[in-house]
Amino acid sequence: MGGGSAGSVLAHRLSARSHNKVLLLEAGQDTPHGKVPAAVLDSYPGTAYLNPNYTWNKLKVTTEVISHNNPGATPPPSRTYEQARILGGGSSINGQLANRGAPTDYDEWADRGAAGWNWDNVLPYFKKVERDMDFDGPWHGKEGRIPVRRIFPDLWPEHAKAVGKAFEQSGWKFIQDQNAEWEDGYFPITISNAYERRVSAAIGYLDPGTRLRDNLTISTDTIVSGLLFDGLQCVGVQAVIGGRPTEFRGREIILSSGAIHSPAHLLRAGIGPAAHLRDMGIEVRAARPGVGQRLQDHPAVAVAAFLKPHARIIHDYSRRHIYTALRYSSNLPGIPAGDMFTVVTNKTSWHAVGEQIGSFIITVYKTYSETGQVRLRSANWQDEPQVDFNLLSDQRDLERMMDGVRRFGAMHLTPVMQSVTDNPFPASYSDKVRQVGLLSRKNKLITDALARALDGPAALRRYLIETLVMEGLTLHDVLSDDDKLEGFVRKAAVGVWHASCTCRMGADDDPMAVTDPAGRVRGVAGLRVVDASVFPVVPCANTNFPVLMTAEKLADAILSGA
């Protein structure tokens, strides 16, 4: 259930055994070979992830901390949170960043009860995923379904080159290979892209040869409405195709619907916290208090600036918006090295103003905020769940985010950065920014006019940035006043579409574990979860490659009879 990154891997691997009959269900559209939409293939992802045809449009989430000690407090505002609805899932619309996380992340998975998931056990599956076009050796795969590569500094735009100099002046070194040894430094971003075209999980794993297998059926535009049970045995799913309800039955059902929709399916089937299920009028099938709990994402804010004309991207070589990033250590007590990650964007949207704005996106990659949750609004399968991330609920996350704004705000004031940027300001991915980023003729006309004005006199540019682009606070405000900085960070922090951990793997004696280390849902039979839901903790990485690794490893477990 779910033809995203994990579902594409599973369909390919499980159908390789001719005696397995595999049905892949996906709510979104197909992306068959030769008919992949241009926006999906594009090296620049902004036109894909803001296309409403490729996402669940009614999904809203909260990101600010909700106080359970003050139930009368005004709830935080809800935000749009793009979740893919297309074959290939997130890999069809994401930023194509292909990294793995820290070895200590996976050792922590094992320590939290996911036996067999330490770094030494998962590295072979990361290598199995990839076909590295640049490097060989013990860290890299050469025969996988997903090509990975980097764009090296000689091809970076002037803004990215200047940022590299600023990083070095701050004491960080250049690292050629992000996915080799885990150490601090800046590097060319590793991307799942070949010859300036995205390679999604659907493109890589559901290739024409795989699609020709007699034992594999791919049913797109198919919405799963519920799970079918015979007692505690899951025996199939209910689905809607073209407005008509239908049922599919199978020996084993695998949920790969993502960390928001997979737990929602379990909850509607009566698997989850008993009190919440009763509140929703749902009969309790298996009381698993961890379903939907401890939701995580990586909190992020940005410090942006106007790019001087010579520093902007020249599209002759690449349409990529990100060329480099920095991994660094906060050095807070008890926190492992490489806990912070700052991406350098050389344009922030597809439109003319987006090409004039660059940013540091400051992300807490080793987050300790684990109080997010997914709950049902009702028992109706057509209602999106209530999703509360509670980002920055851990004080350590807040402190590191504030420190990041100070670091990179101050970096914008250095001579090397002032040679390529002007008018730096604190920024966030607000719904206002998102609305302007939607593809429309109106937005193009508005941003074309604004871009011409921004390239005009400096005084006019400053006025327009302060009145139309900024969210109220200046960089001076947040760098000189800690209360204003904290207020900005708490309000502006958003997730980066790395929802994870709502059906966590764990040990037999862990009451919050939803699945075992083979992905089997505890308390019932015939049902597994294989997606980012099962992560015991979100790794220090963009989550797509950890999901692909997880699907490869669990496919092996299923094929071996585990």
Positions of the model-derived regions?
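N-terminal redox-cofactor-binding region of secreted/periplasmic oxidoreductases
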Residues: 1-562
